Amino acid sequence: LANSYRDFLNHGITPRIPRRGAVGEADITTITHIGLAFIGEEDVNYKGKVVSAKEAMDKEGLKPLHLQLKDTHTIMLSNSQGEGTAAILVHEVENLVKMSDRIFCLDYEGLNGNIEPMREDVNELRGLPGQIRCAARCRKDLEGSYLYSDNRPEHALQDPLTFRGGFIITGAVEDALDYVKKFLSIQINSPSDNPCIMLDKKDVFVNSNFETTSLVIGVEMLAIALAHLSRAVNYRLIRMCMPEFTHLPRFLAPRNGS
């Protein structure tokens, strides 16, 4: 069974899995399509086309899997579809956070913002991990900026909240991301079989280890945090298009926005 997963990956054969299944626990109804592909049934994505699993396997010299004891149980009883999607989400949000920091710094330079809120000692005083990390990255990105110059133009003492606390909002996203990564790592590295077979005890136990509430709460929290980040970026963009606020041409366009 493990070799079938390996062979499909190495030969570029991807089982087609429904996005949604029946209402119930785990991904039982959807990821059974992986098992069906392994035995030569159902369709797969292969070299940019949708073909039958049997056709793709024949072209790659692979033989359909002959399922043994517990193989079907192993394929079906997991949350691999949801967990795999969450893993992709984690990767994309990590990249988004890094990009968000850099865009925020560009906004801050365009604003001629007050850099005091990003001071290391100020953020250590609060103690929020994501906030501290984001502030540190922003300070690094702004190294050499005119914002640190003694000859910089006059600036406001307190900037609008989405500027003054923009990196803190990104930090909140990072805190939510840490939560998701913690529970995702636990779930993808532990079994969710029901019943579970414990070889050391030579026994079988009924359980509910397929329950994903901890991970689901984290993903929902991350979605809320991303909504806050999106709102903050939108408000900063609106501000940057206001000449009475930036003292720059309207919409940052030449000839006063015409």
Residue ranges and their predicted role:
Residues 108-231:
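Accessory "access/gating" subregions that flank catalytic or transport cores
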Residues 44, 196, 252:
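Short clusters of hydrophobic/aromatic residues that line enzyme substrate/ligand-binding pockets
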Residues 99, 130, 134, 258:
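Short acidic-hydrophobic sequence patches enriched in Asp/Glu that either
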Residues 213-258:
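C-terminal catalytic subdomain
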Residues 72-76, 193-202, 240-244:
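Active-site-adjacent bridging/hinge elements
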Residues 1-125:
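Active-site cavity-forming subdomains of large catalytic enzyme subunits
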Residues 14-23, 64, 204-213, 252-258:
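A short glycine/serine-rich beta->alpha loop
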Residues 5, 9, 21-23, 202, ...:
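Acidic, glycine-rich active-site loops and adjacent beta-strand->loop/helix elements
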